A protein has these predicted regions:
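Primarily recognizes the serine-hydrolase "nucleophile elbow" in alpha/beta-hydrolase
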Residues: 123-124, 130-172
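C-terminal catalytic histidine-bearing segment of alpha/beta-hydrolase fold enzymes
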Residues: 177-181, 185-248
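A structural signal for conserved, well-ordered secondary-structure elements
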Residues: 245-350
Length: 350
């Protein structure tokens, strides 16, 4: 086995978001927020920004709770989002993500303050105006719909989760890539709200809206949304010039994959049912991947056809290690080398 140093340090976690406060002179409000700045940020290179809008249950003044329901994205797509500025403001207790406060269009509400925070961060850190992404859950899902309705030209992509939008202004949203998530068993905000928005956008001529209607899922649709690596691959492939032409195409980026000596992909995380820890011969532990039906046969055949040749394991797009199989795989699973267990820890939910 030949081990290569993986780029583990390029994967951010929720713990990397630092605590700050923003004073909004227009409304007189002070907005707590957390922010992640990519390592080696270069302002002249223009960096994408991801705005996270929490739900009603995460309101407060601790400047921490607002990231609680977003943590799944760091495990699922930490490598993808680590190249962006991540912004997570917190709405105070007993308040709401309202754009306006005293009158229509005044933008003195807490969401108005969050919008100006986004503008301030974009200016201070060299944010890319063509790659501004937004997502929110529940109350934050409602806020996501509200912001893209008010500023449809400012966002490259949006992911409202179990929210409510204004279907009467769906024509505003036909030029922005949108991916909606909502559980059919949601008793807090019924999925009819997302059904209505999806159908309204389609009726208005929108061609870049997708709807993940999650059967049997309750109000916690965010657990599915933010563990969906495919969604983040899609999101971070969107840019304003491209999306305005109706093109929201993208390429999936594997988190982990095995490649044969002939440079053929044998499996990726999409082919893995679950991971588990197993005792290794050296007294430590290895991580094993239980493979989907049929993939085991593909792996076994690849071993037979490439006997004595090197296979390669890639992690977050970088070569992790190579190995020459000693025998055919057993128990329909693939066991990663014990020497890389520490690097693969985030694959397992302990």
């Amino acid at each position: 086995t030949k081990l290569f140093k993986p780029a583990k340090e390029t994967v951010c976690s929720s713990a990397d978001l630092t605590e700050k406060h923003f004073y909004d002179s227009k409304s007189g409000k002070t907005l707590p927020y957390r922010i992640y700045i990519p390592k080696n940020l270069q302002k002249d290179k223009k960096t994408p920004i991801l705005l996270l809008l929490h739900g009603a249950g995460e309101r407060g003044e601790d400047n921490l709770t607002q990231i609680r329901n977003f943590k799944g994205m760091f495990n699922a797509a930490g490598d993808i989002i680590s190249g962006s500025i991540i912004l997570a403001p917190q709405c105070p207790s007993d308040c709401w993500w309202n754009l306006d406060e005293d009158g229509c269009g005044d933008e003195k509400g807490w969401l108005g303050a969050a919008w100006r925070l986004l503008e301030s961060v974009k200016s201070e850190y060299g944010g890319d105006p063509d790659r501004i992404y937004i997502t929110g859950l529940s109350m934050g899902g409602i806020a996501t719909w509200a912001l893209i309705d008010r500023y449809p030209e400012q966002f490259a992509a949006a992911v409202p989760v179990c929210g409510i939008g204004n279907s009467y202004s769906a024509y505003n949203l036909t030029g922005i890539p949108i991916k909606i998530y909502h559980g059919t068993a949601d008793t807090t905000i019924g999925c009819g709200a997302s059904d209505e928005m999806y159908n309204a956008i389609l009726s208005a001529g929108g061609k870049m809206v997708d709807y993940k209607r999650l059967y049997g899922v309750g109000h916690n649709a965010w657990d599915t949304a933010y563990s969906d690596r495919d969604m983040f691959c899609w999101m971070f492939s969107q840019t304003r010039p491209k999306s305005r032409t109706g093109d929201d195409s993208y390429t999936y980026k594997e988190k982990i994959k095995l490649v044969s000596p002939r440079n053929t992909e044998i499996f990726s995380e999409k082919d893995i049912d679950f991971y588990l820890l197993e005792s290794s011969e050296d007294g430590g532990y290895s991580i094993a991947a239980s493979l989907n039906s049929g993939v085991y046969d593909t792996l076994r055949e690849a071993y037979e056809k490439n006997d004595g040749k090197e296979f390669t394991v890639y992690y977050y797009g970088k070569k992790l290690y190579t190995f020459i199989p000693g025998s055919e795989p057993s128990c329909e699973e693939f066991v990663f080398a014990s020497s890389v267990t520490d690097y693969l820890e985030n694959l397992i939910d302990y």
